[in-house]
Amino acid sequence: MATSLIPMRSHQYKMPGGRRTGTAATAYTVGMMRVEIPTNEPLPAGPLEDYRKLDDTALASRIDEVRQRLGSRVLILGHHYQQDGVIAHADLRGDSYQLSKSAAERTDCEAIVFCGVHFMAETADILVNRPEQIAGRNGSRVNVVLPDTAAGCSMADMAAIEQVEDAWADLGEIIDTDDITPVTYINSAASLKAFCGRHGGIVCTSSNARAVLEWAFARTKRVLFFPDQHLGRNTANSMGVPLEQMCVWNPHDPRLGGNDATTLEKSRVILWQGHCSVHAMFRPEHVDTMRENLPGVKILVHPECAMEVVEKSDLAGSTSYIINQIEAAAPGTSWAIGTELHLVRRLEQEHPEQNIRFLSPTVCMCATMYRIDLAHLCWSLEHLESGNPVNVICVDQDTAHWSVVALERMLDVTAFKQG
């Protein structure tokens, strides 16, 4: 008889407010490109020590064996930015929301291992363990496991719930907050999604950000957009919102986020001072250099890049958009892509009929995503099999409820636009 993956007890972790999201980096050269590979800090002697002694071939073999024994009871989700050795074991590959949504539609799994970062595992837990779904499983929760709880997101960490609540209170001294819609990028903590749910706000993805802002502006005069200023600015700019009607809120400046009352009153979009550390590495001069060296190249970037980069590019869109553009392009098309290196290199390998380049000559890959390695994946799977899961991400009921409210508003907006 198969062992149930629903444990008598489990080790549940909450990421501390000051969680560490950076690691040391080792530089090496791939062709003409200098690459900085984040290096996991040495682990103290502990549960992973024996796994660290194994090479990748041995780890992959053990992962395959435990997967075969667990069968459909466990679902492995792999984000596009994962390293190839990890993504090879994923049942589903995609962006953060796409993976969580797909997982919520599965009815046969007892546990999910999310090879991504902390906020992604939170979103999966929220969507997979909604009350009606738990009821449909006779009260059983699906454990969502993050192989390494140190896999956070520096951008998500740039907007703590306490900072957002303080900003909201400060804005209320100048502007009627009933006339502000809070919008959080899905790349954020569950507490921020819940904040938006409570305050009439909404979640967005990089795919539907424009539709979400259109919805928000139909309801209120202003938007507070967090945590990624670049996605907010690029989206608002594409909608024709003048730059002088956008301001940046610095959560570390106690003086109205570094603004005065007049600036806030004339602003339609209040952008949180946050950014993706990977996409911030791409610079306008990278676009110029690529066009000089490769005439006819198409520049394709993610909207988390700075506006100056997006405006110089030919195309900008979400991870799924980038993949779809490459898949639909004619053989022989030349591309320079500005997004996370693992994805770009994978596209290059999967589409040898096209000439795909990485936009930047030097980049640091997503350090925290890189923490999910074969050792952590094997360790977490074998603990699931033993009935003693580790690193279970569990969002509290109230936060999950209000997060779902904000997420469902997003789904309604997207469905209306597509209908």
Which residue ranges define each predicted feature?
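Active-site loop-to-helix "anion-binding N-cap" substructures in soluble metabolic enzymes
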Residues: A2-I337, L343-G419
